[in-house]
Amino acid sequence: MSSDRRTARDCSAVFFGEFHDVHVGRAARSRRVHSQPHPHGAGLAAARRDVSRHHAALQSAKALRVLVDLFVERYVDAKLDYIAGLDARGFIIAPIVAYELSVGFVPIRKVGKLPYATQRESYALEYGTATVEIHEDACKPGDRVVIVDDLIATGGTMMAGKNLLERLGAVVVEGAAIVDLPDLGGSALLREAGLPLYTVTEFPGH
């Protein structure tokens, strides 16, 4: 697997730059706001970096192509069987990467969304808990899987996805995301649990 951080930084500049180029009038204010810790906790801090809010960047063929290529180049030689996407924003990028790699796509969904027999995993939120699930036949023992999401904040969703896949016998090769918010502790927690991580960019100070 490749780890060209210079290329990753270039992608970050292209992807998020597309958003600010379209919204020139907001750029200065955006930089000021994004430099301050969020006063209302991890949920809103993560929402501010929600990739789907940067719709202009997603609409840019150049930015989307660069972003997808980064993930594809990293995993092209990893001998994967599946890309697993986390509900919901992981579904933006994960199926595209799976298609480009000619591997299958496994959705890990919020509880109640999958039609057949499932395995469930709950995890803690700032105020309460959440549950995700996976089809019981989504993969088989020994299958090599990368989990993809848009953002790592507290790490709860990706940890739950890891636990579900491993319960089915899969080998979770790595967790991958576009954005890491390292000050929220999720990436450190995941690494301590033995999950290697790859992120395109990070935003400290949240």
Swiss-Prot record:
One of its GO terms (biological process) is adenine salvage. InterPro entries: Ade_phspho_trans (IPR005764), Adenine_PRTase (IPR050120), PRibTrfase_dom (IPR000836), PRTase-like (IPR029057). Coiled coil: none annotated. Pfam families: Pribosyltran. Keywords: Cytoplasm, Glycosyltransferase, Purine salvage, Transferase. GO terms for cellular component: cytoplasm. It catalyses: AMP + diphosphate = 5-phospho-alpha-D-ribose 1-diphosphate + adenine. GO terms for molecular function: adenine phosphoribosyltransferase activity. It is found in: Cytoplasm. Pathway: Purine metabolism; AMP biosynthesis via salvage pathway; AMP from adenine: step 1/1. It comes from the Bacteria. Its EC number is 2.4.2.7. The keyword Cytoplasm applies. Belongs to the purine/pyrimidine phosphoribosyltransferase family. PANTHER family: ADENINE PHOSPHORIBOSYLTRANSFERASE (PTHR11776), PHOSPHORIBOSYLTRANSFERASE DOMAIN-CONTAINING PROTEIN (PTHR11776:SF7). Homodimer. Catalyzes a salvage reaction resulting in the formation of AMP, that is energically less costly than de novo synthesis. This is Adenine phosphoribosyltransferase.
